[in-house]
Amino acid sequence: MNVYEGNLVGTGLKIGIVVARFNEFITSKLLSGALDGLKRHGVEEQHIDVAWVPGAFEIPLVAKKMAESKKYDAVITLGAVIRGATSHYDYVCNEVAKGTSHAALSSGVPVIFGVLTTDTIEQAIERAGTKAGNKGWEAALSAIEMANVMRTFS
């Protein structure tokens, strides 16, 4: 039996990050966490590209474009969608998740879902570097691991 696992060594990896500007006080913290995680695991700063988009709904298109360019070993998506009083939240969350998955499957490049989908602003803050850790950091580690496991199949 063969077992394949990625490792957390980022040396030589090229990573793209797509960040939503909407709720930037949260997404900027997710980005800081992701950048810290990438650099601490060996990804060089000059091998990281960051693209800002207006909101979470716009993330999948840019993530797909980055992935299809084949310039990146993985793409990380970062955003924060917080439930409001209307059904808009459900539509945005569903489409961003589907679009992110489609970008990965159609390109063959790992596209990591680092978009917070929370009921409250407090939950988003907790996941952007306080009580619940930083989901940007976690997305960065997932990107490194997935990029490395994909290399085993090249």
Curated annotation (Swiss-Prot):
Active-site positions on this chain: 88
One function term, GO molecular function aspect: 6,7-dimethyl-8-ribityllumazine synthase activity
Pathway: Cofactor biosynthesis; riboflavin biosynthesis; riboflavin from 2-hydroxy-3-oxobutyl phosphate and 5-amino-6-(D-ribitylamino)uracil: step 1/2
Reactions the enzyme catalyzes: (2S)-2-hydroxy-3-oxobutyl phosphate + 5-amino-6-(D-ribitylamino)uracil = 6,7-dimethyl-8-(1-D-ribityl)lumazine + phosphate + 2 H2O + H(+)
EC number: 2.5.1.78
Keyword Heme: no
Family membership noted in the UniProt record: Belongs to the DMRL synthase family.
The protein's role, per its UniProt record: Catalyzes the formation of 6,7-dimethyl-8-ribityllumazine by condensation of 5-amino-6-(D-ribitylamino)uracil with 3,4-dihydroxy-2-butanone 4-phosphate. This is the penultimate step in the biosynthesis of riboflavin.
NCBIfam families membership: lumazine-synth, PRK00061.1-4
Protein name: 6,7-dimethyl-8-ribityllumazine synthase
Organism: Anoxybacillus flavithermus (strain DSM 21510 / WK1)
Gene transcribed to yield this protein: ribH
